[in-house]
């Protein structure tokens, strides 16, 4: 008889983080996957990070997750998006060698302490009914093997009753040539989970040798490339270029003439696709006034002959794809290695989940990744690590849930959006979703999260020591700058003019001036040069934003006060005077854990919040009396 503390189904980006997190905390963990060889597979684009997404990768890394370290072993073109804007919206991104990424993730997972990997297909799970809610008991594989578990995490990606479409052709699959999961979908439906249908897509893969790069715009990465992980010193792989081309009026004519053949325009038109990553057919239809759309030609590896054309996701028939591609500059003689396609799949309404990502209907069942209605490797990884941590912590009956709030992390923003608002289309993170993005930056994820993770045993002692060393260096340099007084006359010697009022200003305060940076100050304060470049950058960013932090702190304190005003899980909203039936039903279904969470539910009015607060205070005082 096989028994585990935590079982994770799915070996994608979410499943790997969930399994590793649970094992790291000490849970006896089993990861079940259709194929060990596809653990860590990059199903779509060969890249990690981006705007907001790159910050999530840093947050996962700050909690000792895998993604940051793995991409640092596979990065072949690294850049910081939005570098011309403020640090709050910088987006670290790395092009990956697809094979190196997969191998590095597999090496991590297959050698992880407390973690076992099983190659099997799970068709069902069972529960016990000896408590107020059904409780996870076991999983059953396709060959009828029963594996007992206390906690189960579903990270099924696009495999939950997945179907692939290429033109009028369709076949059950969660990924090209990989079977979908049908049994689990039926099991979830039997427990009355609210299931929906979403779709996503991928472009055709191209033969590098059939592309003429000579007339295309070369896109080199940063020099030197920046690592994702706070534990990585540098990127050691050779860096190669991507190339930029674009569609044109001829391309669009081919697409328009064949729109009726594309699955996304025909069979799947009622199923929502990612709004911010539309297919080329949808781009042409929605933006008919545009004569071109960018296409980024991204290499899939250092030794790969395959090019990923980012920007032309399609579900058209193969012959239409070929005709369309040959109208694009550089692709006149292109050969398709693998067809683009669209995939539709089941997802759970994320409002069926708590902030821990445990389901409300089955105790001990957690969901993470695309099954919750999100899109993207990074969003999946962020959910996976939270589900894994909470599943492991909940093995102790007296555990405190690990919940990241909206002012803690982008992961907290994402999960709160999902479980509070739900989603009707694939959810993607943006910096605009975060109210406190001045604090939620890519440079300080470790300062925000690593100590929190260490307190619950999710972070290693080595990483904790690394954090403390960084904090010491940042504090030392900050103090030096605050104690160093600089006159306007000293700055004028270096070509910087500020008010000649003779007033003494600290070097730290001067950094809030957009015309002053660490490079200038280092010519006056020689001690700056004694510190690592990362420390210098960290202190400079903190100083630049310092005046804004003071203003934002009041908002954060108000937010925290509402988040700390807890609503009992067993509260009967029907007993609260003044709530409409509609609001009562919404609150009873959602079961918000706090006043802040209740306030963010659409349709819950300020008056309703006042009534809830009055009810909570009355009953609190009644208990005291």
From Swiss-Prot:
Keyword S-adenosyl-L-methionine: no
Pfam families the record matches: GIDA, GIDA_C_1st, SAM_GIDA_C
GO cellular component: cytoplasm
Single annotated GO MF: flavin adenine dinucleotide binding
Cofactor(s) the protein needs: FAD
Binding site for NAD(+): 273-287
Keywords of the record: Cytoplasm, FAD, Flavoprotein, NAD, tRNA processing
Subcellular localization: Cytoplasm
Chain positions covered by the region annotation Disordered: 204-226
Subunit field text: Homodimer. Heterotetramer of two MnmE and two MnmG subunits.
HAMAP family: MnmG_GidA
Homology family: Belongs to the MnmG family.
Function: NAD-binding protein involved in the addition of a carboxymethylaminomethyl (cmnm) group at the wobble position (U34) of certain tRNAs, forming tRNA-cmnm(5)s(2)U34.
Protein name as it appears in the record: tRNA uridine 5-carboxymethylaminomethyl modification enzyme MnmG
Biological source species: Ehrlichia ruminantium (strain Gardel)
Gene name of the encoded protein: mnmG
